UniProtKB/Swiss-Prot annotation:
Top-level division of the source organism's lineage: Eukaryota
Name assigned to this protein: Ciliary microtubule inner protein 2C
Gene Ontology CC annotation, any one: axonemal microtubule
Keywords, comma-separated and alphabetical: Cell projection, Cytoplasm, Cytoskeleton
Family: Belongs to the CIMIP2 family.
Record PANTHER family: PROTEIN FAM166C, UPF0573 PROTEIN C2ORF70
Listed InterPro entries: CIMIP2C, CMI2A-C-like_dom
Length: 155
C-alpha cells in the first residue's frame, strides 16, 4: 500500500467525489429528481413543484379544477403572477363592503385592555435591565406554603 508521504494514496473514491459534509447547501431527498452537484435542494424542489403546478394548471379545464388559482412568481398565466397583481387602490374593489352593527363595545374595550397588558408583559420579559414592571394580570397565584415555607417544612 502506498503511503501519503509518497504522494500516491490508493483509495476507492473517485477524484471528482465530494463528501456530503463538504457540499454547499442542504441536499434533501426528492425521489423524482436526479442527484447533481450543481443545484441545491431548494432550487430542485421549487423547480419540481413549479413544473407539477404548471402541468396541472395547463391540463385543467376550469381554473378551480385542481385546487384553484395560486399566486406565484413563475406562471404561464399572467393573472396569477404576483408582480402582475394590482398594488394600488384597485385591490379594495373586490373586498366585501359590509359592517357589523352588533359590536359589543364593552367586550372590545376589554380585549383592547388585555392586548395592552399582553404587550406590557412581553416588554417585561424582553427587558434585560429590570426596569419594566411585571404586569399583575399575568402573575400566577401560588399557595402560601410554597412562597413562605414553615421552618419544619424546609428540612
Amino acid at each position: 500500500m502506498a503511503s501519503r508521504s509518497a504522494g500516491s494514496l490508493i483509495t476507492h473514491n473517485n477524484v471528482t467525489y465530494i463528501p456530503p459534509a463538504l457540499m454547499p447547501g442542504y441536499r434533501g431527498h426528492v425521489p423524482t429528481a436526479s442527484f447533481t452537484y450543481g443545484d441545491t435542494y431548494g432550487n430542485t424542489s421549487a423547480r419540481c413543484f413549479q413544473d407539477f403546478r404548471s402541468t396541472v394548471l395547463n391540463s385543467s379545464r376550469s381554473p378551480y379544477c385542481q385546487g384553484g388559482q395560486f399566486p406565484t412568481s413563475h406562471s404561464n398565466d399572467p393573472a396569477l403572477v404576483i408582480g402582475h397583481r394590482s398594488r394600488g387602490w384597485d385591490r379594495f374593489l373586490h373586498s366585501p363592503s359590509w359592517s357589523r352593527y352588533n359590536v359589543d363595545f364593552k367586550r372590545s374595550d376589554e380585549l383592547k385592555q388585555f392586548h395592552r397588558a399582553a404587550e406590557q408583559h412581553r416588554d417585561h420579559y424582553r427587558d434585560k435591565s429590570g426596569t419594566a414592571h411585571q404586569v399583575p394580570h399575568f402573575i400566577i397565584p401560588v399557595k402560601n406554603p410554597q412562597t413562605f415555607p414553615l421552618p419544619q417544612q424546609v428540612l
